[in-house]
Amino acid sequence: MKQKVLFHVDEMERWKLLLHNVKNLLSSYDANDAGVLIEVVANGEAVKAYIQEDGNSLRNKMESLAESGVLFAACNNALTGWKIAKEHLFPFVNVVPAGVRELVDRQTEGYAYIKP
């Protein structure tokens, strides 16, 4: 059975630890495992990490994880609050209407919740 894990981040300074945790979790599964489905939900100020701009030090790590199947979601309410247009986000980021709703929905679907 595939494990389902939900990572939550709402502070910019927590991103590096979160991405490290996601990478470690992915690495802990081998070819014999059923695998893991991981979604990262950002709300609050953490949505700023999804902005495509020169010097975004998290971009390469996020892109690599996205290529490995990790899903990234941004809270539309937070984007609106910070006046960030969807067009300025990385292409692998899915915008959800409300981050807290996404967290509730995924946990109802059986996702384990982790907030580093």
Protein language model features and the residues they cover:
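Short internal beta-strands
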Residues: 38-43, 73-76
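A cross-taxonomic marker for long C-terminal extensions/tails that follow the last structured domain
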Residues: 51-116
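Short helix-capping segments at alpha-helix termini
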Residues: 29-34, 65
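Anionic, Ser/Thr-rich low-complexity intrinsically disordered regions
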Residues: 35-38, 113
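Short, conserved secondary-structure transition motifs
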Residues: 42-50
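Extreme N-terminal starter segment of soluble prokaryotic enzymes
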Residues: 2-5
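Histidine-anchored nucleotide/phosphate-binding helix
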Residues: 18-31
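Short, glycine-rich nucleotide/cofactor-binding loops
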Residues: 7-19, 50-53
